[in-house]
């Protein structure tokens, strides 16, 4: 159930990514794949995103793009292979996957004002620990609370 929920969440993140990038970046998916140039420290984000853009970007647009690209990165991190090797949800690896998802949702909300979490909570509820009385939705809400408390 967890993988299905995260796949649905990734779909929503990707949808917002395309909406934000449409008409502003030459090739949004190629830019996403080349984002490693920023992550590795090879390039600074403002210069890099301007290279990807089909228009001259202002500071506010650059900030939105920075958050959206970080959300895309977190959406990829949700699928780290270590999250799927263990039998129980109540381990650090699946929790990290859910935390990455929550952080991506928070970044999307910061960038666009859209809350893409509403449809995902019921999906996350279906992913339950068999050892503890917790669900992936519990982890998600905790992570969102941390984002709102410490990052807002």
Question: Model regions: which residues?
Answer:
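Catalytic cores of glycan-processing enzymes that make or break glycosidic bonds
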Residues: 1-152
């Amino acid at each position: 159930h967890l993988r299905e929920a995260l796949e649905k969440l990734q779909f929503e993140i990707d949808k917002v990514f395309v909406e934000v990038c449409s008409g502003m970046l030459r090739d949004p998916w190629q830019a996403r794949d080349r984002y490693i140039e920023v992550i590795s420290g090879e390039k600074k984000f403002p210069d890099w995103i301007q290279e990807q853009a089909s228009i001259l970007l202002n500071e506010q647009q650059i900030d939105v793009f920075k958050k959206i690209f970080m959300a895309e990165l977190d959406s990829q991190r949700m699928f780290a292979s270590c999250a799927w090797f263990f039998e129980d949800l109540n381990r650090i690896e699946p929790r990290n996957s859910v935390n990455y998802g929550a952080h991506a949702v928070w970044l999307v909300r910061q960038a666009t004002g859209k809350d893409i979490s509403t449809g995902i909570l019921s999906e996350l509820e279906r992913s339950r620990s068999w050892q503890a009385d917790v669900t992936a939705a519990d982890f998600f809400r905790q992570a969102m609370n941390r984002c709102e408390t410490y990052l807002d």
